A protein has these predicted regions:
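Active-site pocket-lining/capping segments in soluble small-molecule metabolic enzymes
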Residues: 2-122, 140-144, 148-231
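As written
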Residues: 135-136
Length: 231
């Protein structure tokens, strides 16, 4: 099957964004100063984000912003003020974890496309079909799914599928890990993951080893099959 896919690249800084566009990416995604899963990354300021939106659109590409953490009630109004300048600048969509934030964004920014983050832990077709009622148009399914599961989700829901093709994997299902919060007071679901799974651990006096650090995801050998599955 010949399918046109969107190559979406991460862009943690303006330099990375420009490099991704120059390399041929169809779209980029990045975080702003709040509500992103990488609170300690080199995220863009409001001024830089607006400039990034303009830069990407000049080159005929798309730009999505992450709002992929869990939000508290008091933060919803703050979310409105945070997103408003980007909405006005023409942001192409937001990648969201919190279902309450999805509902809020759909109500206050009705023309803003909303994508379900992998942090939402969509692992089955029923879950993907359920979130359609909130106006979600694209889902980033859990990275642990098989090609067959992705294919079934695509066929039965009609949602766009966005799949990771390379990068680190979480020790737990995305959006479900509490390890960083429990042992370090830094919640991964609030953008503060300290990545304790990357540290060496010693068991029963044996030599310290990377017991919880998974191998990186790499799908280059199965890209045609992934595309055919709907990814």
């Amino acid at each position: 099957m010949n399918r046109v896919v969107e190559i979406l690249a991460p862009a943690g800084s303006m330099e990375c964004l420009q490099a991704a566009i120059a390399a041929g990416a169809d779209a980029v995604y990045l975080g702003g100063t709040r509500f992103g899963a990488r609170a300690y990354a080199q995220n863009l300021s409001e001024e830089d984000m607006v400039q990034a939106i303009e830069y990407v659109h000049i080159h005929g590409r798309k730009i999505y912003m992450t709002v992929n953490t869990l939000l508290k009630d008091r933060e919803m109004e703050e979310l409105y003020a945070y997103l408003l300048p980007y909405y006005r600048a023409g942001l192409d969509g937001v990648i969201v974890q919190d279902i309450g934030a999805v509902k809020f964004i759909r109500e206050h920014f009705p023309k803003m496309p909303v994508h379900a983050s992998t942090q939402m832990t969509i692992t089955n077709t029923l879950g993907a079909d359920h979130i359609k009622q909130y106006g979600i148009t694209r889902v980033v399914p859990a990275r642990e799914l098989s090609l067959g599961e992705i294919r079934d989700m695509k066929r039965q829901t009609g949602l766009e599928m966005e799949c990771f093709v390379h990068g680190a994997l979480c020790y737990c299902y995305s959006g479900q890990c509490l390890l960083s919060s429990m042992i370090g007071g830094r919640s991964g679901n609030r953008g503060q993951c300290a990545q304790p799974c990357r540290l060496p651990y010693q068991i029963d006096g044996k030599k310290p080893a990377d017991l919880m650090s998974l191998k990186d995801l790499c799908t280059i050998d199965i890209l045609p099959e992934l595309i055919d599955a709907g990814g």
